[in-house]
From Swiss-Prot:
The gene is ftsB. It comes from Pasteurella multocida (strain Pm70). The keyword tRNA processing does not apply. This is Cell division protein FtsB. InterPro entries: Cell_div_FtsB, FtsL/DivIC. Its main location: membrane. Residues 22-92 are periplasmic. It is a single-pass type II membrane protein. Belongs to the FtsB family.
Length: 92
C-alpha cells in the first residue's frame, strides 16, 4: 500500500512539474499572455498612426489647402505677387 501511495504522489508531482514548467505550462501561458498584451498595444499605436496618415492622404487628394501648405513650408514656394516672411527664433 505504501508503494502505491508513493507512486501516486510521484505521478502527481510529475504532472505538477509539467503543469508549471513544461511546454505550454502555466509560466509559458503567462509569458505568452504578456506578449499578446504588448503586441495589442503596439498595434493600437500603429492603427492610430495609420488613421492619421490616411486622413492626410485623403486631404492631399481632395483638398487644395494641404498641398498649398506643404508647398509653402517644405519647399518655400509662394503664389504670384506674394511675399513670404519666414521668422526664425534666436537660439540661446
Amino acid at each position: 500500500m505504501r508503494l502505491f501511495i508513493f507512486l501516486l504522489v510521484a505521478v502527481l508531482l510529475l504532472f505538477q512539474y509539467d503543469f508549471w514548467f513544461g511546454k505550454n505550462g502555466y509560466l509559458d501561458y503567462k509569458r505568452t499572455a504578456q506578449q499578446i498584451a504588448q503586441h495589442k498595444q503596439e498595434n493600437e499605436k500603429l492603427s492610430q498612426r495609420n488613421q492619421v496618415v490616411a486622413a492626410e492622404i485623403k486631404d492631399l487628394k481632395q483638398g487644395v489647402e494641404a498641398i498649398e501648405e506643404r508647398a509653402r513650408f517644405q519647399h518655400d514656394m509662394v503664389k504670384p505677387d506674394e511675399i513670404f516672411y519666414h521668422i526664425v527664433k534666436e537660439q540661446k
